[in-house]
Curated annotation (Swiss-Prot):
Compartments, as annotated in UniProt: Plastid, Chloroplast
Protein name: Small ribosomal subunit protein uS15c
Transferase found in the keyword field: no
Keywords attached to this entry: Chloroplast, Plastid, Ribonucleoprotein, Ribosomal protein
Family according to the record: Belongs to the universal ribosomal protein uS15 family.
Length: 86
C-alpha cells in the first residue's frame, strides 16, 4: 500500500523515486509527522511555517498531476485517502 512508502523510500524502485506520486507520498508522510509534532508543541512557529511550505509544495504537485493525467491523480488521491485541491 502506498501509505507505507512514505515511511520507507527504499521500497520504491529506483526509476520511480522522482515521480510525482512518490514525491507526494513522501511529502504526505512529512506532513503527518509535523502535524503530530505540532499537536504536542502548538507554539512551535518555525515548524508551522515548514508545514505550510510542505503543504504548498504538495498542492502544486497535485495540481500539476491533475493537469497532466487525471487518472493517475484520482488513483493517487484514492490510495492516500485524502482530498485533492480540486
Amino acid at each position: 500500500m502506498i501509505k507505507n512508502l512514505s515511511v520507507r523510500p527504499s521500497l520504491i524502485p529506483r526509476e520511480q523515486r522522482g515521480s510525482v506520486e512518490s514525491q507526494v507520498c513522501y511529502l504526505t508522510g512529512r506532513i503527518k509527522r509535523l502535524t503530530e509534532h505540532l499537536d504536542l508543541h502548538g507554539r512551535d512557529y518555525s515548524s508551522q511555517r515548514g508545514l505550510w511550505k510542505i503543504v504548498g509544495k504538495r498542492k502544486r504537485l497535485l495540481i500539476y498531476l491533475f493537469k497532466k493525467d487525471r487518472l493517475r491523480y484520482k488513483s493517487l488521491i484514492g490510495q492516500l485517502d485524502m482530498r485533492g485541491p480540486r
